[in-house]
């Protein structure tokens, strides 16, 4: 490494069988490609690994070989030079028919440059075939954890998805913004139906939508986010002008949207506008929404209790609560919600209290309820498993009412939540459960895929909620393949 770059070019050339005359003839070409003109006389030991690789690649490709082996060379160096090397490789393949063997950990690079690929793991061939298909399967497992059994299941599902999947089995419902996605869901689920009531949830917090979901169901009303606290988003405003509801309920737990309330009061057809919430705690807000339904004799004989830490579970339960018009109670983090449950249960002579998720069980089970009231706890340890159990419960409940042929899927990722505020009403209207899939967990993915496969005779289509923040194309293809 004490040699200069100039000397190293001749040494490497000799090791590759190039004569000194050959190197002399192509020296300028090698230096120009490697872009090291200013550093030729610098000791190679002072070069970065990327600069060393530049020289090695330039020397190796100065001729047109029969076989070119590129072993991780493209993993170092800057992006522009990597692109330059890829262009040289493509030229050798397309213009000269050179066989190129690339050893790389870059999934995208293999799919881009190769037509065949071998996935070698721990010295053994795990998969061989079309480069795009191998890269897809490799990428589908990358970054995801789970049991060996789940990994094998998802691996085989990924392999199958490259061979057989019906794209028509999977449809994405999304738009440019979260509010626009919600508007699209409202139009798809209610269509031209005359709407008498409408529930708007101020979207500074998803609590408004979660707690208001049962009220919207009892009113048979669309639920949509406002899209802001200073004014209605254009998409939300357009929905209101299209449907012209007689009454609008604005849910604003924090009392941060007086401007939206004023905007609603000034709508040209002059709907009755009621605002619920004013710098409330979650317990206070839950009680206010409950009282609103109680005063209108909307509630049946069921309650739903969801702990604040079970937010994802609340979205999974939303279609069920909407379908049956069940009031949703959510306490403060520091509060024991048993008192609120007991008070509301007595007010409607509750026969069933549903506890969704794993964190509110103690509060519900310690509530002093009458003997005729049944407690149903639906959930599991771990957010992903808990959401799955709730969604499966909803599927079975809806199936008893008559299968619709639809299931909805979305991502468990927190970034997806703003798009899910309207999902309770949408999924309920089409009688579809909402599965929140954790695309980082092989265990959860395998459970979702197994569920689809077990029920494929009754499922016509998978509806993917959300676009930019939702499940990616690979996940969509994987889900669709489970129905094949």
Model-inferred region functions:
Residues 10, 22-39, 58:
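Conserved ABC ATPase "signature" region
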Residues 82-95:
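Helical segment within the ABC ATPase nucleotide-binding domain
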Residues 98-103, 106-112:
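Conserved H-loop
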Residues 151-484:
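Extracellular glycan-binding segments that recognize GlcNAc-based cell-wall polysaccharides
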């Amino acid at each position: 490494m004490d040699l200069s770059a100039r000397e190293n070019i001749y040494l490497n050339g000799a090791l590759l069988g190039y004569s000194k005359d050959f190197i002399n003839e192509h020296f300028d070409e090698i230096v120009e490609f490697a872009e090291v003109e200013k550093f030729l006389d610098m000791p190679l030991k002072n070069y970065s690994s990327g600069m060393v690789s530049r020289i090695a690649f330039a020397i190796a490709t100065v001729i047109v070989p029969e076989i070119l082996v590129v072993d991780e060379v493209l993993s170092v160096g800057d992006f522009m030079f990597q692109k330059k090397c890829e262009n040289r490789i493509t030229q050798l393949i397309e213009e000269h028919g050179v066989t190129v063997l690339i050893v790389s950990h870059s999934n995208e690079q293999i799919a881009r440059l190769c037509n065949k690929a071998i996935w070698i793991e721990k010295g053994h061939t795990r998969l061989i075939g079309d480069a795009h298909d191998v890269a897809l399967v490799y990428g589908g497992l990358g970054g995801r954890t789970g049991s060996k059994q789940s990994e094998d299941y998802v691996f085989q599902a990924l392999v199958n998805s490259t061979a057989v999947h019906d794209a028509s089995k999977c449809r994405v419902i999304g738009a440019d913004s979260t509010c626009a996605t919600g508007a699209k869901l409202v139009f798809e689920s209610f269509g031209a139906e005359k709407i008498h009531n409408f529930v708007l949830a101020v979207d500074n917090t998803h609590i408004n939508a979660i707690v208001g979901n049962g009220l919207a169901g009892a009113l048979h009303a669309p639920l949509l986010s406002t899209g802001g606290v200073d004014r209605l988003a254009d998409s939300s405003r357009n929905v209101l002008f299209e449907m012209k509801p007689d009454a609008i309920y604005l849910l604003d737990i924090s009392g941060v949207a007086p401007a939206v309330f004023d905007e609603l009061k000034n709508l040209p057809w002059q709907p009755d506008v009621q605002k619920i919430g004013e710098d409330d705690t979650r317990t206070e807000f839950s009680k206010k929404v409950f009282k609103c339904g109680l005063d209108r004799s909307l509630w049946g004989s069921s309650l739903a209790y969801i702990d604040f830490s079970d937010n994802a579970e609340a979205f999974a339960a939303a279609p069920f609560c909407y379908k049956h018009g069940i009031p949703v109670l959510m306490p403060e983090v520091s509060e024991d919600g048993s008192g609120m449950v007991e008070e509301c249960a007595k007010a409607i002579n509750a026969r069933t209290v549903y506890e969704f998720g794993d964190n509110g069980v103690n509060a519900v089970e310690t509530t002093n309820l009458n003997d005729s009231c049944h407690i149903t706890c639906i959930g599991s340890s771990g957010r992903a498993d808990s959401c799955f159990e709730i969604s499966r419960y909803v599927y079975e409940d809806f199936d008893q009412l008559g299968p619709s042929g639809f299931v909805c899927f979305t991502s468990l990722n927190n970034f997806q939540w703003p798009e899910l505020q309207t999902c309770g009403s949408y999924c309920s209207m089409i009688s579809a459960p909402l599965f929140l899939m954790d695309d980082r967990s092989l265990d959860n993915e395998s459970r979702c895929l197994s569920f689809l496969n077990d029920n494929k005779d009754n499922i016509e289509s998978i509806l993917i909620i959300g676009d930019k923040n939702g499940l990616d194309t690979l996940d969509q293809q994987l889900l669709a393949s489970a129905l094949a």
